[in-house]
Each structure stands twice: as C-alpha cells, then as structure tokens.
A protein has these predicted regions:
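Hydrophobic face of amphipathic alpha-helices that form TPR/SEL1-like repeat modules
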Residues: 30-40, 62-71, 75, 98-107, ...
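Short helix-capping/linker turns of helical repeat alpha-solenoids
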Residues: 24-26, 56-59, 71-73, 91-94, ...
Length: 282
C-alpha cells in the first residue's frame, strides 16, 4: 500500500494499471496520475502527466497545466504560459478555465477582460464564477455597478452550492442596495452565514442585536457575536468589544481588556480605534 492522501486505497497494481492506460493515450488516466503524484508531493511527475495530456488537446489538462505554470507546481512559474494554457482550455470549451483566466486577469488588474471571462463562465452555470461576477457587479469591476445584478449572481452561486456569500447578501439587504431595505431578511442572511462559520457575519449580528434590528435587542448576544468576530480577526468587532469592556455593557467594566482589544483593532488599521487611542492618549 502506498502512502497517499489522494488515493488512500491505491495499490501498486492499481498505480501500474493507471500508468499503462496513460501510456496508451488515456488522458483521464494521465490526469489521475498527475493528481496522485501531486498528492504525495512528487511534483515533477505530476507536471509530466498534466503536460502529456495537453498533447491530446484535452481541455481539463490544459486548464490544469495553466494552473501549474501559474503556481510553479513541478515547473518554474511562468504567467505567460499560464495564460496561454488557460486560454487554450477556454477555447476548447472548459468552463472552469474561463473562470481561471478571468481570475488571472482580475489579479493583474485587467478588469474588462476579467469580467468577460467570468461572466461567460457564470452564464454557463459555474458557481465560483457566479460568486465572483456578483462581486464584480457590486464593486463596479469591469462593468457598471449594479447591486441588483450582484444580488442575482450571489443567489445563483448559492444555488450551485457556493459558500461564503450570506454576508454579501445580508449587506445588500441591510443597506437597501439593489433591493428595498429589508432588515429582517438581512438578519436571516447574517444568521445563516454565522451558522456556517462565515466570519464576516459575526460583526453584523452584533450590530443588529445591539440595536434591536430584525430581532429583540439583547446586549448579551450582541457581545457574544462581537467577541466571535473579534476572535476571527474582524477589527470592527474588536473595537466594539473594547467599547463594551470600557463602559461595562453586559460585561463587567475592564479597562485592561478594553485597551487590549482597542490596540488590536488599531493595529489592524481601524480608524475609529486609531483615533480613540490618540484622543485618550492610550
């Protein structure tokens, strides 16, 4: 039995059978071998089999080879070749490649090209592309800003099983961006996200419990969610935890803890915390 995280039941005979199939031009076997060798960190062999699959114009192999070149897996990093193979796979109809090259262009600040590729992938039902397209619409990246289209794209992404989108939908509903403001709906989105450990939702739940928005006012629950957010690295939540300790809201007044969280928030770049430290000479 081989030590493999990917094929945890792969035997020597099964490995040899895959190698034989790959030698007989079976491109799916080549990709399986590449994934296997990558899982055991034999990256030269992984690269070899991914590259071999592209000789047969196999779109999945072309996309994966683009990724290998982009990340330098089993080869020197080469962004020119990465883009070439992503484009080749996209030309051969690989939807994920269209998303990958869109993401590639986005990282390189080529926003119109990024938008076009991501939208193409999203229009073909790829969930990750739907999520990114929503972000593009929300923030006017490569296209005119449209909160309504952002919301539609986020909902499509959720339907495809994508995670990490409840805070985006919650924010749109909370502020009335693209839809009439709906505080109850916003609370439900944030709560769903928090239940899936979507850390961006913790702060907003704290705000809504502290103000009684969409739910009965409850400082104990507000503090709980602020603390969850602070523990997850949210500088706004850290600031509010500091304020609660400073003023004894729900928790006993504790100036040392207040200073601790205030300084952490300021270190994270939160302006209110930075200003408060300067004003209070902390």
């Amino acid at each position: 039995m081989l030590n493999s995280r990917w094929f945890n039941m792969l035997t020597e005979n099964e490995l040899n059978a895959l190698i034989t199939k790959a030698d007989q031009s079976d491109v799916k076997a080549m990709i399986k071998l590449a994934e296997y060798y990558r899982s055991i960190n034999e990256l030269d062999k992984a690269f070899k089999y991914v590259h071999k699959s592209t000789l047969y114009s196999y779109p999945e192999g072309e996309r994966k080879l683009g990724y290998y070149y982009e990340k330098g897996i089993g080869c020197d990093k080469d962004l020119v070749k990465a883009r070439q193979y992503y484009e080749l796979a996209a030309m051969h109809g690989d939807i994920k490649a269209k998303y990958n090259i869109g993401l590639f262009y986005y990282k390189n600040n080529q926003y119109p090209q990024a938008f076009n590729y991501v939208k193409d992938a999203a229009d073909n039902g790829y969930g990750k592309a739907c999520a990114l397209l929503g972000y593009f619409y929300e923030h006017a990246i490569g296209a005119a800003q449209s909160f309504e289209l952002a919301r539609e794209s986020y909902l499509k992404a959720l339907e495809q099983g994508e995670k990490g989108l409840y805070h985006r939908l919650g924010i749109l509903s909370y502020y009335g961006n693209g839809v009439p403001q709906n505080i109850d709906e916003a609370f439900n989105y944030f709560y769903q996200g928090a239940n899936e450990e979507e850390k961006e939702c913790y702060y907003y739940l704290g705000v809504m419990y502290s103000k009684g928005e969409g739910v009965k006012k409850d400082y104990s629950k507000a503090f709980y969610w602020y603390q969850q957010g602070a523990n997850s690295g949210d500088v706004k939540a850290m600031y509010n935890v500091a304020i609660y300790y400073e003023n004894g809201i729900y928790v006993p007044k504790d100036l040392e803890k207040a200073k601790y969280w205030l300084k952490k928030s300021a270190a994270g770049g939160f302006d209110l915390a930075i200003n408060k430290i300067q004003i209070d000479n902390i």
